[in-house]
Swiss-Prot record:
This is Glucosamine-6-phosphate deaminase. One of its GO terms (molecular function) is glucosamine-6-phosphate deaminase activity. Transmembrane segments: none annotated. Keywords: Allosteric enzyme, Carbohydrate metabolism, Hydrolase. It catalyses: alpha-D-glucosamine 6-phosphate + H2O = beta-D-fructose 6-phosphate + NH4(+). PROSITE patterns: GLC_GALNAC_ISOMERASE. Pfam families: Glucosamine_iso (PF01182). Homohexamer. The record marks S151, R158, K160, T161, Y254 as: Part of the allosteric site. Pathway: Amino-sugar metabolism; N-acetylneuraminate degradation; D-fructose 6-phosphate from N-acetylneuraminate: step 5/5. Its EC number is 3.5.99.6. Belongs to the glucosamine/galactosamine-6-phosphate isomerase family. NagB subfamily.
Length: 270
């Protein structure tokens, strides 16, 4: 695990964006050998997308040879709905960079056969070999994508029933009316995420502190989905100060010193 303890949400966003750009540029993608990037939606990554757009406009990166796979999508919510994850991604990221439309992959929550759609998505990922970097956020209960507490840690892309906590949390995007929030979603599985070459999770705000504690100091437990990433060879957790509040002082000190010792070396992004 690589734990990046920062001070502010803006620092988290800038660090994450620069890490993504470094990975893409170091990979030197081509049309025949694209960089495969997994992406989330929600409030946490929004500033990271804004920073990526800024750096793209500054000529620091091109997304022309990047293929993206999003984590999830609501079921039975039209793509053109302002709160669909299709709309979120195009409005907040894709419309502002040079990514090719055919390289964008988002689950179709309006298909008649959800199982077939989930299988198709898994096969599409496999056709590229693997996802090189999957960025995600984490819920207050430790869920990643829509892998709610008690999800199988070997699960694949599938349809999930959303918990009441998730419905309440997401109601802020639906006029604070929980009845408007779709009750089902298609989501990548925990196993799908673990297959990625690298996973980078962003956590900001004091409400994420217990999830961060579970990810860093807790045991692997299907009630805290994020804890499964302890098994991943290249797991990066980037947090602001508020999200570190439940960690032991010596834990934060250890990782802070560790980051300082590798800064500027070839091991910094390992």
């Amino acid at each position: 695990m690589r734990f990046i303890p920062l001070q502010t949400e803006q620092q988290v966003s800038c660090w994450a964006a620069q890490h993504i750009i470094n990975r893409i540029n170091d990979f030197k993608p081509t049309a025949e050998r694209p960089f495969v990037l997994g992406l989330p939606t929600g409030g946490t990554p929004l500033k990271t997308y804004q920073e990526l757009i800024r750096l793209y406009q500054a000529g620091k990166v091109s997304f022309k040879h990047v293929v993206t796979f999003n984590m999830d999508e609501y079921v039975a919510l039209p793509e053109e709905h302002p709160e669909s994850y299709h709309s979120f991604m195009y409005n907040n990221f894709f419309n502002h960079i040079d990514i090719l439309p055919e390289n964008i992959n988002i689950l179709n929550g309006n298909t008649d056969d959800h199982n077939a759609e989930c299988h198709r998505y898994e096969e599409k990922i496999k056709s590229y070999g693997k996802i090189h970097l999957f960025m995600g956020g984490v819920g207050v209960d430790g869920h990643i994508a829509f892998n709610e507490p008690a999800s199988s840690l070997s699960s694949r892309t599938r349809i999930k029933t959303l918990t009441q906590d998730t419905l309440i949390a997401n109601s802020r995007f639906f006029n604070n009316d929980v009845t408007q929030v779709p009750k089902y979603a298609l989501t990548i599985g925990v196993g799908t995420l673990l297959d990625a070459e690298e996973v980078m999770i962003l956590a900001t705000g004091h409400q994420k502190a217990l999830a961060v504690q579970a990810a860093v100091e807790g045991s692997i437990n299907h009630l805290w989905t994020v804890s499964a990433l302890q098994m991943h060879r290249h797991f990066v957790l980037v947090c602001d100060e508020a999200a570190q509040q439940e960690l032991k002082v010596k834990t934060v000190k250890y990782f802070t010193e560790l980051e300082g010792s590798v800064a500027g070396t070839d091991y910094q992004d390992k």
